[in-house]
């Protein structure tokens, strides 16, 4: 999901943006835990 899609989506469909952002954050945390 590119950041541009988030800006394209309006208040009606903001959920997909949050889902993509949360997914990236979870992936980063998962990698950090794997390293440690």
UniProtKB/Swiss-Prot annotation:
Keywords: Auxin signaling pathway, Cytokinin signaling pathway, Developmental protein, Ethylene signaling pathway. The lineage of its organism: Eukaryota, Viridiplantae, Streptophyta, Embryophyta, Tracheophyta. Belongs to the POLARIS peptide family. Disruption phenotype: Defective in root growth and leaf vascularization, characterized by more anchor roots at the root-hypocotyl junction. Cells of the root meristem and the cortex of the primary root are short and more radially expanded. Reduced meristem cell divisions in meristems and reduced axial cell elongation in roots. Enhanced ethylene-response, hyperresponsiveness to cytokinin, defective auxin transport and homeostasis, and altered microtubule sensitivity to inhibitors. It comes from the Eukaryota. Mostly expressed in the embryonic root from the heart stage and in the seedling primary and lateral root tips, especially in the columella initials and lateral root cap. Also detectable in aerial parts of the seedling, sepals and leaves, principally in vascular tissues of the lamina and petiole. The keyword Iron does not apply. GO terms for biological process: adaxial/abaxial pattern specification; auxin polar transport; auxin-activated signaling pathway; cellular response to auxin stimulus; cellular response to cytokinin stimulus; cellular response to ethylene stimulus; cytokinin-activated signaling pathway; ethylene-activated signaling pathway. Required for correct root growth and vascular development, probably by modulating both cell division rate in meristems and cell elongation in roots. Negative regulator of the ethylene signaling pathway that modulates microtubule cytoskeleton dynamics and auxin transport and homeostasis, and possibly cytokinin signaling, thus influencing root growth and lateral root development. It comes from Arabidopsis thaliana. This is Peptide POLARIS. Induction: Repressed by ethylene (ACC) and cytokinin, but induced by auxin (1-NAA and 2,4-D).
């Amino acid at each position: 999901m590119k950041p541009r899609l988030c800006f394209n989506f309006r208040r009606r469909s903001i959920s997909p943006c949050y889902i993509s952002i949360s997914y990236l954050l979870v992936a980063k945390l998962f990698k950090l835990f794997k390293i440690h």
